[in-house]
């Protein structure tokens, strides 16, 4: 697949810290799909997404976002993407509505456009009753939702999420999953890491399994089952089998 035909194309992505964290990883996410990246702790999931989002410079490899070289033209690439980590960073002294309007201003969005969009985002995440309260008193889950709303205010085409459901209660998780599903149905592309395999199983069009910095399996759930001889198993059992095989081969 050509870079122009995909939302995200990663080739040979490599990063070393004290050890090799990401090992010549190749990854393609198709336009309009929901892609879940799963793997054990320390597998390289977050490091991979941080390099894709332009927050960490790779030692080697390339990243293309809708055909744009994200390493040589990071400004153009970042205009098309949103990044939300599992540790939300927001301005605590602002209310959710003020924060979204502030972020919209950074993107140069006219208030006449940004204010209705901000109200819609807050309502979709169940934050409308709290839109005039300062964020400093919010739980981590509420802060996570404010951060997500802020990341989406410029209507990005590629949404990059690192454990977006961490710290959320069942109601908040449903809000987030509903919003992400709506975005994909409207043509956006989502790539996210998650340890909640049930979420990957239910929401993702395709799933990538990463272990020791390498993509060891990829496909729809049906394809993963067929390729690995686990025709009726859950993603959890399949994941454990794949990771154990990779560990034994290491």
How does the language model describe each region?
Residues 101, 105, 112-130:
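Conserved ABC ATPase "signature" region
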Residues 61-72, 76-77:
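Conserved ABC transporter NBD signature motif
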């Amino acid at each position: 697949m050509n870079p122009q035909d995909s939302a995200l194309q990663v080739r040979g992505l490599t990063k070393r810290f004290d050890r090799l964290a990401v090992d010549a990883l190749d990854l393609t996410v198709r336009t309009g799909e929901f892609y879940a990246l799963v793997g054990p702790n320390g597998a390289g999931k977050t490091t991979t997404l941080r390099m894709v989002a332009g927050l960490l410079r790779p030692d080697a490899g390339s990243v293309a976002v809708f055909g744009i070289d994200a390493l040589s033209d990071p400004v153009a690439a970042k205009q098309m993407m949103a990044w939300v980590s599992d540790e939300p960073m927001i301005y605590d002294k602002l209310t959710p509505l003020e924060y979204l309007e502030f972020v919209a201003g950074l993107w140069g969005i006219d208030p006449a456009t940004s204010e209705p969009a901000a109200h819609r985002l807050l309502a979709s995440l169940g934050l409308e009753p709290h839109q005039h309260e300062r964020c400093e008193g919010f739980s981590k889950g509420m802060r996570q939702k404010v951060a997500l709303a802020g990341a989406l205010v410029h209507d990005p085409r590629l949404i990059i999420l690192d454990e977006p459901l961490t710290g959320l209660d069942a109601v908040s998780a449903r809000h987030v999953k509903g919003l992400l599903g709506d975005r994909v149905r409207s043509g956006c592309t989502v790539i996210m890491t998650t340890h909640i395999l049930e979420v990957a199983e239910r929401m993702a069009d395709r799933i990538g399994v990463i272990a020791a910095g390498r993509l060891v399996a990829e496909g729809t759930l049906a394809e993963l089952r067929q390729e690995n001889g686990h025709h009726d198993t859950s993603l959890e059992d399949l994941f454990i089998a794949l990771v154990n095989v990779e560990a034994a081969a290491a």
